[in-house]
Amino acid sequence: REVGWLSPEVQAAVATYLDMPAIAVHEIASFYTMYNLKPPGRFKLTICTNLPCGLRNGNQSARYLQAKLGIGFNDTTADGLFTLKEGECMGACGDAPVMIVNDHRMCSWMSNDRIDALIDELRAAASDSPEPKQMGKKGER
């Protein structure tokens, strides 16, 4: 969380610290969507495409979001605002299709209209407040 992503150097340092093979760290980091292997946009949108969400138009919502943002999964918009990830089950199947913003905010029933409203809200939030600084040295902001 200090820099927002796990570079190969950070993964190697974690492997050394935990006394485990570097490939094991990479396997874990690449499996879970909360870990980023390249710098993410300001807003990371993770959309569920597993079966329950898929049966309730989750895949259509994912395609709509890709078209709206002009990016595919694991890509970031040119303005650096949005990164789009495909996620595994988020445990809210009754609210399908679901999406998580920045690994913390669950968004439910993500129809095209709700996606449009969310993107507008996030764009407005980005223009209202500057990008938060990344953490540098311990305690530095």
What are the functions of these language-model segments?
Residues 1-141:
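Signature of N-terminal electron-transfer/Fe-S-associated modules in redox systems
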